[in-house]
Amino acid sequence: MLIGIDVGGTYTDGVLFKQGAIVATVKKPTDDMNLKNTLLEVLDELLPSAGEQKIERIVFSTTLVTNLLATGRGERTALIMLPGHGLPHDAYDICPDIFFARGTVDFRGNVIEKLDQKEIDDILARIAAAGIKRVAVAAKFANRNDIMEREIQSKLAADYPDISVSISSEISNKLNFPRRAATTYFTAMTVKEWMRFAAEINQAITERGLDSEVHILKADGGTFSLDTSSRRPCETVFSGPAASTMGGLALSQPNLNSVVLDIGGTTSDIALIIGGEPLYASKGARLGKHYTHINAFAVNSVALGGDSCLDYDGGIKVQNFRRGAAACFGGDYPTVMDAFNCKMALGIGNAGQSAEKLQQLAAKAGMESSELCRQVVNIVIERLISSIEAMFREWENEPAYKVWEVVNRRKFKLDQIIGIGAAATAIVPQVAARMEVDSFLHDYSPVANALGAAVVRPTLAVELHVDTPNNFFSVGPGGIRGSLNDRGGMQLGEAKNMARQYLLDMCREQGMESYASESSFYMEEQFNIISGWSRSGKIFDVGIQIAPGFISEYKGVSS
């Protein structure tokens, strides 16, 4: 038996899944101040339906990291950069507390310029004097040689043990220095909050006496273990939108071109499925104005949800925040959900309360309640359609989007909008009708996020870089470095076997060994190194992954 729990900003949803059937579902308000209690409430409603059967795995999706970064509530964090030669320092506008230091490594990992120890001492003293307790360190080509990052890390540990540090070579083995620096910075900013969240999960699991694998849903639609997430919490950014994307795919499953529209209480998430495959952001997740090395779906969030409150200020306003539940569910203020409830005669909750609160606002606005509802419905539909169309303009630049048009020899055409979330039944059919496409709603659409979390499989990508003339190799994630036993005649097949073995080792460490056989290579590159008039060796770059997808036993659910 499997449990999926989606911890949203407004509601926490849970699903108990067994052998192709959803056995139980639950939806509870999220208590940000006491998250453990929310998790316990969800577990307490799901577990009785499991009886004596063992819960094999529990998967959580969460907006914790997304909300921390979006609201600017992350703790003040410093970034020490060793950019070497190239771009001017003002090109790296990543954060306010940024410090540049000398020290250069070339693209082969050779040290060109050593650290200036006095300069580093001065930078660390300034960081400590400012009261900053978190530091990210990023050196250009540290994925080829991390010696300078390690030196700074060791100095911080020795001289300032109360300051936590994250280094880029442990976060990502990929090239593109600005993205690696940004990813490391956001990791350092969120790691302590994530550790607290992980501790609350562990406490809730322990208090209910469960002996289950605990996984977290990542931005790429796969999962990793809770322990692994504590080292790379940034990979959980957009975990919520990933859950809705996989949940929408799990419920619909046909090979159609679909927009997944997840209408939550506070926000709406938009994602695209092309021919049954989610569209990925080719440049990685974008946090603010910065691209990162986080693999993620191409998603967008709109500050509009079913609980978005309504107001009058010279005109009807649909606010980008909530003041509690919809009136039909006992709230004190009229919301988007209430307007759709009355306009479409949906009979959701206490429809009389919806009508009463809307009538009060209509009187304030000097209009009939029916006109108020009409205006709200139009505002919401137009705002969502505008957001979808803006996303299409962005998606047109994604390689997978263009490839689909080339392969199918026709322009991309949207087939349907998949509705996810409690408010989807009210809003999505209206949006789809206005866009002249089909809408898809399932009985389990309100808890599709939790279903998506429950039935996706663990994922892992390993990248190996080998430089035979320098007798060096590196493996990511984790910042593994080593020397070659035989650097003479290494061939691509040997490099692939080496990458496969590291993937298997990491799978064993993370309890994913049973999925290792499903791995595939996504990058196989080799380059000859010429010295004088002859070849002196080769450089290999190999990538192997267990790609995102559903667990083998998932074949869909019945309505």
Locate each region found by the language model.
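N-terminally biased helix-coil "hinge/interface" segments that flank
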Residues: 1-559
